[in-house]
Amino acid sequence: MWPVNHDHYNEGFGVWRPETQSYHMGLDIMPGYGTTIVSATDGVVVTAEYSGSFGNHVVIYDGGYYTVIYGHMIEGSIPPNIVPGAIVKMGDPIGQVGSTGRSTGPHLHFEIHDGDTPVNPWSVMNKYATG
């Protein structure tokens, strides 16, 4: 299940970013400021906090292959039950689209790792998405 409507996005996986001298390791989806973000998978919350790059973000491990990062959420939008160690189900609300951290406008930074390796969210979601 996609965490938000993914019809509009502005930066894809693997795009070179000269300003940071690095590749973009996720997909920036733009469903609109304040849109509810849901968990794309069942799993366990690894972290729900603020960082300079991802802003307010949630990281969920699916217990098998993937760790999923949801970044740039509105301050205060992460529900109180979304804390490290909490169990989430696919479709559970985990926050709202915002523009916190290193962000140029409202969007969801959606990043998936297989172990320590970032993978293209399109490939994973096209293979496993049910919604």
Which positions does each model-derived feature cover?
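Surface-exposed, glycine-biased beta-strand/turn segments
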Residues: 1-56, 90
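Short amphipathic beta-strand/extended segments with alternating polar/hydrophobic composition
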Residues: 4, 8, 69-72, 119-126
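Residue-level recognition of beta-strand microenvironments
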Residues: 12, 48-49, 73, 97-100
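Zn2+-dependent peptidoglycan hydrolase active-site motif and core
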Residues: 22-25, 39-80, 106-112
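Glycine-centered loop/turn positions within well-structured domains
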Residues: 27, 35, 68, 95, ...
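Conserved, short, structured surface segments that act as functional micro-motifs
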Residues: 57-61, 84-131
